[in-house]
């Protein structure tokens, strides 16, 4: 996605020649239909933000895709390679779907070869005090496993995303995740309310 768009759009090598007040500090930064209250730097290479609100409390890295984020006042810091997708579900719900840029979404949850947010899923569970017993449904394949929580609160959504990505000791995030209805990546694709 990012490399293809860069190949099509990056025709000017010297960004200073682009007569625009907000020259991109890196040609591989793409912001589509979004509101951003942060400043970008050359370190934000390979960044795609679409249909999202990225507030002043956000810190982004590189190699990231950020999509569907509702208006928020979160304090969130994402390391390189961590992506966020928020999917509207039902009339008022949001499903939090973080992932690693290179995750392939396949493999059993208890396999050390199944990657999630750029680390083995077994390590992700261990960091958060979870086991496969905490999943209600399929655990034989990450694509079909109910990993992604539903919430109707934007504030809770931010807590869930922080817990699922960079703050595994966040007790509130763990409690929210354990008590939420969860969907698999397959279910999200089938049930998303894209008209919202």
Where are each of the predicted segments found?
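Left-handed beta-helix
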Residues: 1-196
